[in-house]
Amino acid sequence: LHLCDRRQRQMCIRDRLRDKDINLTFRKIEPFYADVKLKDGDTVREAGLEFNVLFTPGHTVGGVSYVLEEKKCVFVGDTLFRRSIGRTDFSYGSYEDIISSIKNKLFALEGNYIAYPGHGPATTLDEERAANPYVR
């Protein structure tokens, strides 16, 4: 390629990197508010299933997990991951709260529940009790 062609492409890339709509840089996130506020111990019925609500703050202030007793599984969102935990470095996160939520709420569930995080592979609470380096 000719030097001028390369320079022109570099300038185009530079301009695109400055555009937040193209480069996927986080824009300021506007707050939003829940339509319904759930509390620890609430029951939610959806699609013929009954979920128990566990208040599991830490990743967010109002974080909850949903326990499906009949299937021995829990939907943990971004609280717990396979061998990891959710981020707490945002202004609304708390490392102390997320550790407490995992140890005192999730790990308090009796039995080997399957834990489904918001993303990434599923795990089990027994595996995380034994091997998660963040909550030993």
Task: Kindly label every feature range from the protein language model.
Residues 1-13:
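Single conserved hydrophobic/aromatic residue that forms the stacking wall/gate
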Residues 1-4, 48, 107-108:
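Structural motif
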Residues 14-18:
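Short, charged, surface-exposed secondary-structure boundary motifs
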Residues 19-22, 26, 43, 50-55, ...:
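Metallo-beta-lactamase
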Residues 36-39:
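Short acidic-hydrophobic, aromatic-tinged amphipathic segments that line or gate anion-handling sites
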